[in-house]
Amino acid sequence: MSESELGRKWDRCLADAVVKIGTGFGLGIVFSLTFFKRRMWPLAFGSGMGLGMAYSNCQHDFQAPYLLHGKYVKEQEQ
C-alpha cells in the first residue's frame, strides 16, 4: 500500500468519524431535550455509537488493502 493511498484512507476515516460522531451527538441532544429531561447519557450514547460505527468502518477499510475507492467520471458527450 502506497503512502498516498494510506493517507487517503486516513483522511476518509477521520472525515467519516467526524460526521458519525457529530450526527450521534446531534441525535443525543434531540432525544435528551425531548424525551429524557435533559440528561447527559443520550449525548454520550449517541456519540459512542457514532464513534463505534466509524471505528468499524475504518477497521474494514484498513483490513481490505485491495479495495480501492474510486471516483465517478462523467463521460463527455460529443
Swiss-Prot record:
Name of the protein in its database record: MICOS complex subunit MIC10
Membrane topology: Single-pass membrane protein
GO CC terms in record: MIB complex; MICOS complex; mitochondrial crista junction; mitochondrial inner membrane; mitochondrion; SAM complex
UniProt function note: Component of the MICOS complex, a large protein complex of the mitochondrial inner membrane that plays crucial roles in the maintenance of crista junctions, inner membrane architecture, and formation of contact sites to the outer membrane.
Family designation: Belongs to the MICOS complex subunit Mic10 family.
Subcellular location: Mitochondrion inner membrane
Organism, scientific name: Homo sapiens
Keywords linked to the UniProt accession: Acetylation, Membrane, Mitochondrion, Mitochondrion inner membrane, Transmembrane, Transmembrane helix
